[in-house]
């Protein structure tokens, strides 16, 4: 169990954290009814359940109180300055009361939900008759956006940025919209305390391609995990105390949020034999500095940070010492000492160290102000995952003061910032838990559809996987819906995975080609008599195979196409070249394995087919053009002997390499066993 880092996040080296916007804590029947409707929609495992249609009807009824698009546009154009959504809500509350305010909030959320599901194509139009109009979902999205829904504004801004789904590209307007949403996210401060090595977005398509695949987010939430940690902590396990400390700090997996209990767990982990966990010392320093679970004690914070450094070289501890010095929490402000500590943290790849160092250069504290260099350092903080760095970089690229103005990059940075601030990961993790734990594919499809509307590539790909592979949505148009989604993914992200999946659908005749999208670049080795389906599939394979970063799966599929003559000219040598290129482009063994195996199988297949053809048994499914040099004739005894010898030699080669692989696997297992600690 690895140690935990509570990430110290400071905008300008300040200690205080911004609080989330807090609505009145009174119960609201309107909001509660909306929440029940959403849960009703998510609870079923298939779109065909009667309660799903009922939920759609309720959402449509909730959305019906929203003003028309024309009214909302006139309201916006009639205002001298853009009104913030929170201000509008307060005005409605003051003029009409809390119920009217809540109905406004529910109406815009319902509009966004219905719009996102209609755009995917899984909304029951019989339950929402007005949605039969093909433009309805775009108008609904814009209405929700103009009403101030943050997710709707993100989704509409994303469409303005990329120019798709019937929305004309307008990067300046997209930048303005996403910047406004990002500013709301900034007010929240860091979403929560963070564990080093957060789970990345997970792709369900990898389940079909990697036998060792598992969901990190689900594994981290295993039902018995907390019980195991409690047992280990009772037996004095330092790492278990550290893990339980984190859970108590944030209120995770049934552990009640309790800063005092978190402090005690970290204290136990820090007091064990050998000086305790260095990470626990860092966490104690963080809590002493912020007065979390204990009184503020800057001297004790410095002591714990120093121990974390001496016992484990913990990079964030250097940053913590820098914050103490910068803010003068130990006496006089000392920018020189703060700079030195931030530099030490940055040397150890600490994102907060880089962020604070960048701020020192931008503000000119203890160094000549150099905003351009500060932005360069801020880029590194963003690469390492600092929560606020994308926002600051977005401002820099939008203004063009420290760097050349770049609207597209600024928009992308604000979009990245919004993704983290508005907790897209929670929806994605809940969705994958629906699939793997609860076998609720429909609930997962709903969650992924909402997040994909915001511009999440992984969520969009998972929508496609669920449409193709699950029973969440079983209507006849599910493959066409998947293909439409794949084309949008390709347009927005240039995704090689999406190109391969779309090519597979085209090759198997499950969807019709889009002549303007799928057939715009002819492959020079395309077969003249190939069908439109095969030509379209090949073009997507080629685009993914020969992109800036060649994609192994596309290369191996194109290799098979050349071997079998599917839409391309038959060329055995070209097949082997593509299989080898796929292996070279692979990032891990599960990507490389199909390429290596394809090369071995194709050679053996050609050898066996050649022998079969000589004996007048046919070419074993391979195109005859592979054997154009062979004459159809009966084989003499000597020829039979030669063919038999070739087959035996081929089998011997396979056996030899199989033995090599087994030997290597056995050696790896033995080495791993030797590395395990003895009991």
Description of each model-found segment:
Residues 190-219, 395-398, 426-436, 463-469, ...:
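TPR/TPR-like alpha-solenoid helical repeat scaffolds
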Residues 58, 62, 111-120, 124, ...:
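Hydrophobic face of amphipathic alpha-helices that form TPR/SEL1-like repeat modules
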Residues 188, 201-211, 293, 330, ...:
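Alpha-helical linker/edge segments of TPR/alpha-solenoid repeat scaffolds
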């Amino acid at each position: 169990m690895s140690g935990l880092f509570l990430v110290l996040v400071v905008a300008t080296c300040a200690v205080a954290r911004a609080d989330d916007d807090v609505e009145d804590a009174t119960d609201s029947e309107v909001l509660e009814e909306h929440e029940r409707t959403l849960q009703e929609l998510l609870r079923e495992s298939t779109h065909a359940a009667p309660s799903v249609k009922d939920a759609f009807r309720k959402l449509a009824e909730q959305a019906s109180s929203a003003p028309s698009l024309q009214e909302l546009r006139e309201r916006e154009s009639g205002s001298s300055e853009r009104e913030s959504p929170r201000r509008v809500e307060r005005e409605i509350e003051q003029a009409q009361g809390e119920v009217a305010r809540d109905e406004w909030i529910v109406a815009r959320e319902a509009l966004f939900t219905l719009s996102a599901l209609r755009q995917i194509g899984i909304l029951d139009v019989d339950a929402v008759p007005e949605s039969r109009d093909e433009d309805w979902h775009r108008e609904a999205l814009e209405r929700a956006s103009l009403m101030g829904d943050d997710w709707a504004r993100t989704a509409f801004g994303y469409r303005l940025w990329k120019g798709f789904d019937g929305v004309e590209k307008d990067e300046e307007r997209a930048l303005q919209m996403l910047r406004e949403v990002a500013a709301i996210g900034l007010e929240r401060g860091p979403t929560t305390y963070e564990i080093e090595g957060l789970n990345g977005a997970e792709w369900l398509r990898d389940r079909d391609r990697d036998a060792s695949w598992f969901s990190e987010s689900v594994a981290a939430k295993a039902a018995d995990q907390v019980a195991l940690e409690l047992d280990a902590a009772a037996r004095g396990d330092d790492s278990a105390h550290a893990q339980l400390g984190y859970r108590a700090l944030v209120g995770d997996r049934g552990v009640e949020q309790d800063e005092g209990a978190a402090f005690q767990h970290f204290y136990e982990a820090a007091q064990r034999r050998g000086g305790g966990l260095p990470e626990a010392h860092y966490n104690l320093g963080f809590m002493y500095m912020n007065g979390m679970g204990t009184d503020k004690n800057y001297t004790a914070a410095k002591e714990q940070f120093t121990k974390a450094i001496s016992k484990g070289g913990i990079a964030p501890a250097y940053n913590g010492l820098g914050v103490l010095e910068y803010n003068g929490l130990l006496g006089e402000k000392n920018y020189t000492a703060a700079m030195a500590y931030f530099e030490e943290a940055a040397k150890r790849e600490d994102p907060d160290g880089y962020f604070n160092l960048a701020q020192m250069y931008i503000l000119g504290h203890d160094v000549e102000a150099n905003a351009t260099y500060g932005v360069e350092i801020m880029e590194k903080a963003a690469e390492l995952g600092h929560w606020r760095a994308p926002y600051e970089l977005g401002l820099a690229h939008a203004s063009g003061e420290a760097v050349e103005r770049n609207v597209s990059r600024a928009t992308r940075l604000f979009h990245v910032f919004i993704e983290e601030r508005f907790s897209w990961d929670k929806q994605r993790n809940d969705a994958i838990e629906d699939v793997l734990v609860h076998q609720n594919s429909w609930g997962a499809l709903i969650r992924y559809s909402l997040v994909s509307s915001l511009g999440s590539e992984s969520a969009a790909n998972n929508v496609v996987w669920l449409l193709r592979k699950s029973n969440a949505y079983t209507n006849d148009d599910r493959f066409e819906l998947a293909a439409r989604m794949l084309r949008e993914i390709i347009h927005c992200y240039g995704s090689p995975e999406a190109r391969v999946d779309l090519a597979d659908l085209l090759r198997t005749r499950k969807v019709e080609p889009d002549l303007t999208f799928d057939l715009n670049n002819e492959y020079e080795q395309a077969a003249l008599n190939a069908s439109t389906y095969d030509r379209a599939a090949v073009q997507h394979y080629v685009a993914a195979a020969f992109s800036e970063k060649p994609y192994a799966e596309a290369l191996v599929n194109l290799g098979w196409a050349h071997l079998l003559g599917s839409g391309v000219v038959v060329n055995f040598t070209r097949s082997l070249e593509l299989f080898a290129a796929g292996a070279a482009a692979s990032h891990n063994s599960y990507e490389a394995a199909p390429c290596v195996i394809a090369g071995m199988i194709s050679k053996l297949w050609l050898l066996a087919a050649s022998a079969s053809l000589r004996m007048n048994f046919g070419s074993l499914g391979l195109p005859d053009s592979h054997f154009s040099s062979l004459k159809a004739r009966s084989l003499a005894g000597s020829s039979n002997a030669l063919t038999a010898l070739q087959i035996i030699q081929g089998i011997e080669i396979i056996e030899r390499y199989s033995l090599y692989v087994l030997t290597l696997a056995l050696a790896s297992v033995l080495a791993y066993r030797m590395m395990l600690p003895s009991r």
